[in-house]
Amino acid sequence: KECMVDGTVCYIHNHNDCCGSCLCLNGPIARPWEMMVGNCKCGPKA
């Protein structure tokens, strides 16, 4: 299965498709909301 490269926007439904991790700007507390609004992007594995 192909994975999404760093910089690709990741949402709740596809956050596991990142090659690395799905990183959100405001940290884990705001994560569900951030993912819904598209503020999270794939990045290096944590």
Swiss-Prot record:
Tissue specificity of this protein: Expressed by the venom gland.
Main location: secreted
Keyword Protein biosynthesis part of the UniProt annotation: no
Subcellular location: Secreted
Pfam families: Toxin_28
Region annotation Keys region for toxin activity: where it falls in the sequence: 31-33
Gene Ontology CC terms: extracellular region
Paired cysteines (S-S): C3-C19, C10-C22, C18-C42, C24-C40
Keywords: Disulfide bond, Knottin, Secreted, Toxin
Entry's Gene Ontology molecular function annotations: toxin activity
Function: Insecticidal toxin. It inhibits insect voltage-gated sodium channels (Nav) by partially blocking the channel pore in DUM neurons from the American cockroach, not by acting as a gating modifier. The inhibition is only partially reversible after prolonged washout. In vivo, the toxin causes flaccid paralysis followed by death when injected into Heliothis virescens larvae. It also causes uncoordinated movements followed by full paralysis to sheep blowflies (Lucilia cuprina).
The family this protein is said to belong to: Belongs to the neurotoxin 16 (SFI) family.
Domain-related comment: The presence of a 'disulfide through disulfide knot' structurally defines this protein as a knottin.
Record's protein name: Mu-segestritoxin-Sf1c
Annotated source species: Segestria florentina (Tube-web spider)
